[in-house]
């Protein structure tokens, strides 16, 4: 694992996830569309950690978002060091790092990186199904390939649909014009993906999305920062108006925790170079905090708040 200037939210650093309940991994790069070129979100893990540098000094403070105190048993295992000239090797290293966390009995929380990161992340759950993917994103992400690349950031949900251990999918926050063509929308719906648009969430809240999750399901949560409105998180590569609000996503996470078990979580597509104020990183980092708390209190979750 790579070294860190600071850990996420002041959680202790550890190279070994054994004994932890939740283990964070930074993943700057996975699969670029331009060979040898680092991701537009490669700096995001460091930005997410830096956004909460003061948070580690306040573990005894009450957190009103999570309704309690920060969970115990959380460690930051640093970054998975990849090689942008060797995407297959990088994906294998990501999958191996996540598998190591799972084998240690901890829940992995991944700080991406772009939206190609969920593919090797999900791959680590082979043999651990059946799983439901709950995605927050402005885009469908069902492209089979882009310029011959099948593992890039337009394809994570397509690749997830091909993994036998993933049996359900709920996609929340879609809006506007993105990468999806008519064929991809048809394929997603034919496979059984439940699509909940951003407009539906604005009209009815996150209840309709939560209704698509089977009680007791084991869920992988993936949050693309562009799923939120650019007024909330402007630091993304693909801005689109009409996105989800911060508390939509918080309510979704805690709603999931009340009816399902969250077995893995990732956040991707923060673009630090479009975030000069650091507000996007702060907002995204707080979503990660809520994700950690939701993992901790979900049925069968590993830890409780302290």
Where are these regions (language model features)?
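Conserved alpha-helical scaffold segments that buttress catalytic/binding sites
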Residues: 1-306
């Amino acid at each position: 694992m790579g070294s860190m200037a600071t850990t996420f939210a002041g959680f202790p650093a550890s190279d070994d996830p054994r004994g932890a309940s939740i283990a964070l991994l930074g993943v700057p790069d996975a699969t670029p569309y331009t060979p040898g070129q680092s991701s537009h979100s490669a700096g995001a893990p460091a930005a997410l950690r830096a956004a909460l540098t003061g948070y580690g000094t306040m573990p005894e403070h009450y957190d009103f978002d999570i309704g309690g105190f920060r969970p115990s048993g959380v460690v930051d295992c640093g970054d998975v060091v990849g090689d942008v000239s060797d995407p297959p090797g990088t994906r294998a290293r990501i999958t191996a790092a996540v598998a190591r966390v799972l084998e240690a009995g901890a829940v992995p929380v991944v700080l991406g990186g772009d939206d190609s990161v969920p593919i090797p992340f999900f791959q680590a759950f082979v043999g651990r199904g059946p799983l439901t993917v709950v995605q927050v994103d402005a885009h469908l992400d069902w492209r089979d390939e882009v310029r011959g690349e099948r593992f890039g950031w337009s394809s994570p949900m397509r690749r997830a649909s091909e993994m036998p251990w993933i049996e359900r999918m709920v996609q929340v926050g879609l809006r506007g014009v993105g990468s999806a063509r008519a064929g991809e929308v048809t394929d997603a719906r034919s496979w059984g993906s439940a699509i909940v648009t951003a407009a539906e969430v604005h009209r009815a809240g996150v209840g309709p999305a939560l209704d698509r999750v089977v009680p007791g399901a084991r869920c992988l949560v993936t949050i693309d920062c562009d799923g939120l409105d650019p007024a909330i998180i402007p630091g993304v590569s693909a801005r689109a108006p009409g996105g989800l609000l911060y508390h939509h996503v918080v309510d979704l996470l805690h709603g999931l925790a009340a009816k399902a078990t969250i077995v893995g979580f990732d956040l991707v597509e923060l673009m630090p170079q479009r975030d000069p104020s650091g507000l996007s990183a702060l907002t995204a980092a707080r979503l990660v905090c809520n994700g950690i708390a939701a993992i901790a209190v979900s049925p069968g979750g590993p830890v409780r708040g302290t």
